[in-house]
């Protein structure tokens, strides 16, 4: 899958039988910090990264999830290449699972402080965690009172990024990877379904905690997710702008994995499935099994692992990669255009500023950048 990841010509069959390329995460050993590594494509990426010999720090919501992850990854770590530069090949030397609950900025601040105290440089910071509550009629709230989709998918990630940026800039060929989605763009197939993404003047975020939507409108679960993915791109672009202005260099890669619907009960759609089990089952049957428009978690995980570790042609700057459907069973992973709103520099600066203010007002330590 990832031979020629950067060639713009990577076309993959989307049937369930094709084997993922074993070279997905090959390359010099890197320290990768990953969110959303306990399930879905994040877990698949974590497995491939460990198997390829990289060192992982995976944020976990609580001690129980950290223990479960260790149990899953222990046998995978034993399959790592023999010729590793690490003197200690134990799982404990290659996997750290600090507690950092993305729905609680206090937990994220505590986690970031521990990582900063430890002081280990981060080569690749992978902000991958995300949730969606399709079909929900009422908003859920984070510990600080922000709508939960926005809080987890964007706000906690910006807080983490701002705090850990010094460690990232100390890394080897440092890289930021942010998981977004094609639905951020109202002109794409997924973006056209339901209300489109749109932040307007960020009236809801200006209000602070308690706003159901970033634009100040009434709650809509699908739009909340689309808006959060738009925020991911604006955040990534604004960081790139700030660093360029300061003379700093960083590879900033945002990407869309495509539509990933696992066959089990876990993965990204686990929350939406609880809201509308019949509708989600029907959607999966049509999109995955009949039309074959979906990507498998294994291949999406391989793409994420490759973005985190393989060498891109351009060592610095922002790029957006998308895994787009060409037809039944065929997808192309290539550099793509982001939406018109995602290219709005003024909106990116305002979102960053208001998000940083919201984080600071929640008791977070002063942010870098």
Task: Show where each model-derived region lies.
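C-terminal helical subdomain
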Residues: 283-335, 345-346
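Short, flexible loop/turn segments with low-complexity composition
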Residues: 320, 365-369
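Extended hydrophobic/aromatic segments used for targeting, binding, or gating
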Residues: 38, 65-68, 99, 263-298, ...
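C-terminal/domain-terminus segments
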Residues: 141, 246-256, 317-340
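A catalytic-pocket lid/entrance helix-loop region that shapes and gates access to the active site
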Residues: 272-275, 340, 351
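Rossmann-fold NAD(P)H-dependent dehydrogenase/reductase core
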Residues: 2-272, 362-366
């Amino acid at each position: 899958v990832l031979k020629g990841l950067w060639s713009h010509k990577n076309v993959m069959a989307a049937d369930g039988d094709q084997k993922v390329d074993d070279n997905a995460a090959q390359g010099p050993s890197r320290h990768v910090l990953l969110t959303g590594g306990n399930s879905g494509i994040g877990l698949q990426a974590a497995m491939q990264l460990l198997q390829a010999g990289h060192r992982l720090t995976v944020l976990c919501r609580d001690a129980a999830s950290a223990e479960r992850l260790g149990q899953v990854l222990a046998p995978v770590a034993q399959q790592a290449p023999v010729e590793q530069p690490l003197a200690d090949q134990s799982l404990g030397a290659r996997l750290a699972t600090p507690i950092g609950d993305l729905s609680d900025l206090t937990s994220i601040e505590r986690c970031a402080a521990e990582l900063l105290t430890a002081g280990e440089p981060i080569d690749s910071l992978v902000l991958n965690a995300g949730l969606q509550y399709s079909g929900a009629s009422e908003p859920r709230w984070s510990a600080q009172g922000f709508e939960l989709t926005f809080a987890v998918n964007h706000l906690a990630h910006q807080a983490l990024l701002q705090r850990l940026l010094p460690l990232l800039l100390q890394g080897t060929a440092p890289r930021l990877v942010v998981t977004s989605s094609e639905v951020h763009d109202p002109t794409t197939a997924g973006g056209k379904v339901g209300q489109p993404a749109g932040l307007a003047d960020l009236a809801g975020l200006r209000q602070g905690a308690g706003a159901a939507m970033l634009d100040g409108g009434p709650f809509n679960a699908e739009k909340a997710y689309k808006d959060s993915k738009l925020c991911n791109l604006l955040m990534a672009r604004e960081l790139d702008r700030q660093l360029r202005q300061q003379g700093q260099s960083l590879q900033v890669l945002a990407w869309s994995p495509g539509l990933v619907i696992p066959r089990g009960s876990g993965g990204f759609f686990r929350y939406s499935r609880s809201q509308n089990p019949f509708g989600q089952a029907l959607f999966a049957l049509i999109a995955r099994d009949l039309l074959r428009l979906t990507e498998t978690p294994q291949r999406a995980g391989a793409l994420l692992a490759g973005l985190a570790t393989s060498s891109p042609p351009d060592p610095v700057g922002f790029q957006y990669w998308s895994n787009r459907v060409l037809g039944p069973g065929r997808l192309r992973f290539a550099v793509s255009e982001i939406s018109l709103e995602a290219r709005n520099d003024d909106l990116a600066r305002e979102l960053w500023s208001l998000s940083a203010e919201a984080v600071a007002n929640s008791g977070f330590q002063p942010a870098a950048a």
